Each structure stands twice: as structure tokens, then as C-alpha cells.
């Protein structure tokens, strides 16, 4: 298995989820304004979804936290992403875990899973097992089955 990279805001929800996974993980710094943080190996990104909204140019980038955008704008970091997992809040309706959709589409990587807030014990088990299976089959032709964001499981039926 290869590494996890994640971002967590001051709420620490994503951080707590990653800790419960018990897998090697690296946190994207909250205050890396220059985007100089770099990874050294392929990774799966775990990211929270922010509130969203449309910019003056009509682009909707605010679902993805700015430190994650800076991190992925680094071509080295972007070249090593292999998949994304998103966290969110079902109170946001259709925007639930939307950061995962955006990153999956823009980086051309599978969207493996989504979970609410800091996840349930079942989410932790599913992600842990799913990551093992994902890394084991990354080079197989079957890896295409992972490209189904609309079918990722969610808690509370969202």
C-alpha cells in the first residue's frame, strides 16, 4: 500500500478520520500560501468539501479548499495523485462531497469513496479495505471500475 495525503481544516474532522484509519498519511499544511509542500510517492488524496459558490468568472472552485488547490497546482504533486476520497456534510444537498467530483474530473483519477463529517466506524473499515484493494489492482484493467463517483457509497443515503 502506498501513502495517503489529506487536508483538514481547524475543525479536524478529516484529521480524525485519517487517524482512525491507522495508515501512513501526510497532512497538507493549512498555511502553505506558496504551495511549496511536495510529496515523494503516489498517493490517494482525502479532502473535505467546503460550502461552494460561483466566482466572478463563473467557475465554481470554492468546494475544494485553497491549500488543496495550491497543492494540486504543483505539477509534481499532481503527477502522483492516484485517486480521491471526499468528506462532506449532507446538509449541503447536491454539493455533498463535491470536492471529490471536481478533483476526480480535473486530475483524471478515480473517486473512491465519500463520507460524512468525520465518518462512521463502517466508513473507516470500508476505506481501509478499499484502499488495499485499490493499490493491489491499480495496474490491472479492472482499475476502470473505480471511476464511478456517482456510485460511491455514502452514509445516511445521500
From Swiss-Prot:
Similarity-based family: Belongs to the NrdI family.
GO terms classed as biological process: protein modification process
Job description of the protein: Probably involved in ribonucleotide reductase function.
Organism annotation: Rhodococcus jostii (strain RHA1)
GO molecular function term, any single one: FMN binding
Upper classification of the organism: Bacteria, Bacillati, Actinomycetota, Actinomycetes, Mycobacteriales
The protein, known as: Protein NrdI
